[in-house]
Structures are given as C-alpha cells and as structure tokens.
Amino acid sequence: MTDRVLPEQIRNFGIIAHVDHGKSTLADRILQLTGAVSDRDMREQYLDRLYIERERGITIKSQAVTLQWDCDATQYVLNMVDTPGHVDFTYEVSRSLAACEAAVILVDATQGVEAQTLANLHLAIENNLLIIPVLSKVDLPSADVEGATLELSEVLECRVEDVMHVSGKTGYGVKELLDLIVRKAPPPKGDVTSAPRALIFDSIYDSYRGVVTYVKMCDGTIRVGDKIRMMSTGAEHTLLEVGVSNPEPQSRHSLSVGEVGYFITGVKDVRKSRVGDTITTDTHTATVPLPGYSNPKPMVFSGIYPLNGNEYSALREGLDRLKLSDASIVYTPETSAALGFGFRCGFLGLLHMEIVSERLNREFGLATISTAPSVAYEITPDGEKTLVVMNPSDFPSGKIKEIKEPTVKVSILSPKEYIGSIMELCQARRGVMQGIEYFGSVRAELIYVMPLAEIVFDFFDSLKSRTKGYASFDYNPEGSQPADLVKVDILLQGNKVDAFSAIVHSSKAYSYGSSISKRLSELIPRQQFEVPIQAAIGSRVVARETIRAVRKDVVAKCYGGDITRKRKLLERQKQGKARMKLIGRVEVPQEVFVATLSSYK
C-alpha cells in the first residue's frame, strides 16, 4: 500500500446496528472478500479482540480497518469502522461515526428495527452521514425479508428498492454492498495544505507499545517524528509510529487528509489520548479543535470491595491497569464498616459495570463483591450548599430542602400487542409518557422520561419478561427532576449495616425494606438469641423480620420430679439469653453479603 492516497479514492464508512444484528459477521465477510484476511487465518468476530467480546458475542471497543477494493477499474481505499451496539457505549459510537462519511444501517431480517437501531440512526444523521440501509441474515428460514424491508424503508423514508439484502454468513450481497459504498458514499473533505487536525475516535492500551491512538485525518499531514499536541489538554508527545490497520498494524511514513490510522507515542496512560480530542502539530498548530468532544460521564455508581480484605492494594492496581485501556471508569477509595476497604466506581451503564467486574476477576484473579448500583443525586440540606451524593452512606442527616435525581429519555420499541403491559411497567417506574409512534402495522415506539434509578436495577429484565423478549430499549440523559426520596437503613440488632443502605423513592421504601429484611432473615444463620432485622427511615422503622433463637432443651435431663426444678432451669436460660442479647454481636458471613447484594443488581 502506498503512503499517499488521494482523498477522492478514499471511502470512510461505519457499520451500526442493534446488539446481535450481524455487524461483526458482516465485517468478517468484508475482510475476506477484500483479501485483508486469508481464509486460513479467518476466525469468527475477527475484529473483536477482547475475550469478553468473543464470549458474549458483542462488540465493546470500536475497531477501524483499512481495505483495498477495485470498482469501475479504479482501486479505492475503504476505511471500515465496526462499532459497539449496546446503549452503554453510545459515546464511543458517536465519536466513531465522526470519522466516517457514510453509515451502513444494519437491521436483522428476523428481528426488524429495534431501539438501538433508531438511536444509532439519529447519531448518523447528527453527523450528516450518508445512510445506506441494509437488511442482514436474509438467508435464515425465520427471516421476514419483505416485512423488515418495508419497516426499514418507512423509518428511513426511502424507497423499498434502496434497501440492500445481505447475508454475513454466506456472503450473499456483500460485493454489491461494497460497490454501492464506493459509488454513493462521498469522499472525505479537508485541506491538505492547512494546519494538521486529526480526530481521536478510539484508543487502546498495548502492554508492549503503550497507548495506540486511532485517528481520522481531517486536515493536513502528520508524519513520523512530528511533535504532536492534544488540543484539549495541551499535552505534547513525539510521534514514534504512524500506520493503518490492515487489519493487523502496518506502519507508514505519514497520514494525510481523509485517511484513518493509528498513532503511537510511547505514552502509557490512555487518559492522555481522550476519545473525541483533536491532535495537531507543534510546528504548524491548528487553532480551532474539531467539534463534539466531551468527557463521557458515568451514569451508574457501585462500591467494589475485595472478598479477601488483604487484596485491597491488588484491587487498586487492577483498576489502575483497567483504566489504561478504558478511560471511562471512574473510581475513588471508600470504606465500609461491613465490607472494609474498597472503591466507589462510576460506570457508563450496567453492562459496563458487569464487564469491569468480570475483567478484574479474569485478568487479575480478584474475587470482588459489588454493592447495589446507585445514581448521583443532588441534595440540598436546609441552609447549606448542594451536595452530589453517589453513596447512600453520604446521605446527609437533618432537614433537607430539596433532592434532585437524574432522568433519562427512554425509547422502547415493541410489537403492538404488548403496549398495555409496557405502559403499566413504565408508570410503575414513575415514567412520564412523551409520545407514541407506530411503524407499519406491527410495531410501535414509546417515548418516556424516567428516573435513571428506576432502570438501573431490573427494568430490562422486567421489560423482556412482559414482552416475551420482543421489546428493546435505549436511553439518553435528559436532565434532573425534584423527587421525594428517602434513605432506608438496615439494622441488625440495632446496628446499621451500611452495605445494605439505599436511597429510594418514599413510595417504595416499605417494599425495599421488607424484601431485603426477609432475604436477610433467610440467609443469616440463627444465633443463641433472637435477632431483630429492621428497615428504618431515620428513626422510624418501616419493616421488621426476626431471626428466632436457637433453643437448647435444658430440661432434657429432668426425667420427672418436681416441676419447680424445670421452671428454675428455664428461668436461668431465659436470663442468660436476655444477657446475651444485650452483649451479643451478630456475625454476618461473607456469603450473606454476596447473596443479598447480587439479588439487587
């Protein structure tokens, strides 16, 4: 591949879709068809490098690959970006699309248009991309090709004939798709003579080479040896290597307008190559950064503690190393009276939280326990400044003037027959309906504004069970709203157990308190004395369960005789148990914490 490629011969496109609609399989066939990967070296989900991606069959990190394709007797360079499909990684999708001029919207012929399809479509439209509608999995017996084609054409307001049919499994229609991309997608724009500007759309950590930064050149040329500058932080580095992924790394002398490739500077911290930032050079410095950069904000917070208290420093080291490859993790040290030393971590969503816990276990051999997920509340105590509270333990005591909770705009796509049960679920979760839109004769999109706290527990599971698995949903931050929230504490023998505290809506305080009290009463071993488990809001107890005492039969040795002898023994036992209740402590086994907290994730 020559170093200099004319912008007119470059086509940059992304593949976007809902989870499990065949993005990575289509990418595999494109790699084979263009000759980038030989049949011998080919494997499923070739671009998904993380073992979790391969096991779960999902894409977590965006991947860009440079391919060559001949069309109309001219050789073109195709830069293909395979993006994540899960709602947690929407920011990553939006920055990846900023590196493209066209987007292939992929819809599973067996599933039809789903919520994340619409969300990604809106992202593509915001980035002014040419939309190429494609129906995948058309070879499956269960595929409703005609119905899905009609639905996709209605959503995009295009002709039915414009929707392409492909099969990533068999390769049907893939050649025609690549030809269409070359003919319809616009070439990249940019000025080769102006100050260099490169958009960072992804960065990964390589244990041998340090941070590998994936970029799209928007203006100018950047060469090996140039001193580059990050426009958001002003940090400067010398460029050690420039190249493209083909799909394996292939070093080059330079990258110019329209090209997509990677930079290596030897930096070991991925936070210094922030996704969405603009790179320029020290000698010919650009003054205006590329638009759209923002730091992805964590939406869900949870405490992570090592099961073995001696592994606190190992957990810190594990999180530090994960942060190298995933800049969106946020964590600060915290202490729990029940669980010991750990970290309060911020995540993009529940899937992100699950993946981080799994990577800590698999990559660093750390067994951890996570507290129930919570969100960030804005709490204003009477006569004091507003506090941002992410941990129920930090909930202020005393009179509170106002509490605000974060809200999200939720889009739910479902077959029409389940609309009633979905509306019932959303209303139970304090959702406010914003609108409903029908697609064809079988599907509808429901728009709700809901508190984020109501969807981080089990909303997805409840939605799937009420719709037999057919509904899908997507959400975006919407702002915040005042709410009637309270802190529910769980007391064992009158002592608070901070690991079980939660901030909940006042209407759900009783149900939360009674359910967790009941669960604890079933899990905590019986003691020599009676143990009360109470759920309390401040000093007011809202729910209670009692673990009955283990009772020794002290009169077993009395085979007859005077009844007063038995009464004396029973009275002595009663006094001993009363004394034990005063001074006794309830030891809660680690397994009880694990079982109780895991049931509330």
UniProtKB/Swiss-Prot annotation:
Catalysed reactions, as listed in the record: GTP + H2O = GDP + phosphate + H(+)
Compartment annotation: Cell membrane
InterPro entries, per the entry: EF-4 (IPR006297), EFG_III/V (IPR035647), EFG_V-like (IPR000640), EFTu-like_2 (IPR004161), G_TR_CS (IPR031157), LepA_C_sf (IPR038363), LepA_CTD (IPR013842), LepA_IV (IPR035654)
UniProt GO BP: positive regulation of translation
Membrane association type: Peripheral membrane protein
Keyword terms of this UniProt record: Cell membrane, GTP-binding, Hydrolase, Membrane, Nucleotide-binding, Protein biosynthesis
Zinc-finger found in the keyword field: no
EC number: 3.6.5.n1
Annotated positions binding GTP: D20, H21, G22, K23, S24, T25
PROSITE patterns: G_TR_1, G_TR_2
Keyword Nucleotide-binding: yes
Enzyme class name: hydrolase
Primary residence: membrane
Molecular function terms, GO-annotated: GTP binding; GTPase activity; ribosome binding; translation elongation factor activity
Family the entry assigns: Belongs to the TRAFAC class translation factor GTPase superfamily. Classic translation factor GTPase family. LepA subfamily.
Role: Required for accurate and efficient protein synthesis under certain stress conditions. May act as a fidelity factor of the translation reaction, by catalyzing a one-codon backward translocation of tRNAs on improperly translocated ribosomes. Back-translocation proceeds from a post-translocation (POST) complex to a pre-translocation (PRE) complex, thus giving elongation factor G a second chance to translocate the tRNAs correctly. Binds to ribosomes in a GTP-dependent manner.
Protein name (Swiss-Prot/TrEMBL): Elongation factor 4
Lineage of source species: Bacteria, Bacillati, Actinomycetota, Actinomycetes, Micrococcales
